[in-house]
């Protein structure tokens, strides 16, 4: 930890009164593991990448939302046209009489669940507020900080209204096919996913859906599902006593030998090597 990279307030905030600002990542490059002197919300707009948060890997793409605390360690690797925005804030500088703990998971000791998703409607509403927030956070007039904090309050309420667990899209017809598809894929970690059956259920064109998915995420549907499963396998290898064959089954691979081949191709090491290396670093 002595050599841990720490992002400092003075490099992101204009003065000691500013509570909120926006850091664009157009695109997000590979970024080494780091912590912060501040907290942040991470909103992914497009592309894909590997986000490792407190040693847990997440394959991220459009609609992914993270609540990051100052002490959290995270990094970005294997990025592909990854476009995101960081809304960074200092909890101790917030002055509005808002129940921030109810709005922001992990805020000053509140229960923390870091990873959520936003559907297209929530993304559109959040983007509008973030654009206004970015404008105010770059402003120099006397009320800029107050306006930015008001907009931050609006943003966290908008996110709370529209966010949902990664595998639990609310039953509504207002979300897009891509939102429904990504949720269906998240629910297919342990079982085969049949795209033709999904398209039949949603009465949509399989070819068009494949094109839309690749345009928004930079991956094919099969690539995304495979990498989500491998991320889950990495987590289980590090944090569970399950045998490799059991993990293979829990990650949708009926053949453990095939699982090992895919895992090695994606990570550069066998499942056993990954587990050994992870245990050494703990």
Swiss-Prot record:
- Output the InterPro entries linked to this UniProt entry: AraC-bd, Homeodomain-like_sf, HTH_AraC, HTH_AraC-typ_CS, RhaR_RhaS-like_N, RmlC-like_jellyroll, RmlC_Cupin_sf, Tscrpt_act_RhaR
An annotated GO cellular component: cytoplasm
Origin: domain of life: Bacteria
Q: Name the residues annotated as site: Interaction with sigma-70.
A: 246
Report any one BP term from Gene Ontology.
Answer: rhamnose metabolic process
Pfam families per record: AraC_binding, HTH_18
Cell compartments where the protein resides? Cytoplasm
Question: A Gene Ontology MF term for this entry?
Answer: sequence-specific DNA binding
Q: Which CDD domains match?
A: cupin_RhaR_RhaS-like_N
Gene3D superfamilies for the chain: Homeodomain-like (1.10.10.60), Jelly Rolls (2.60.120.10)
Q: Outline the extent of the HTH araC/xylS-type domain.
A: 179-277
Q: What is its main location?
A: cytoplasm
Q: Subunit structure, per the record?
A: Binds DNA as a dimer.
- What is the purpose of this protein? Activates expression of the rhaSR operon in response to L-rhamnose.
Name this polypeptide is given: HTH-type transcriptional activator RhaR
Species, as recorded: Salmonella choleraesuis (strain SC-B67)
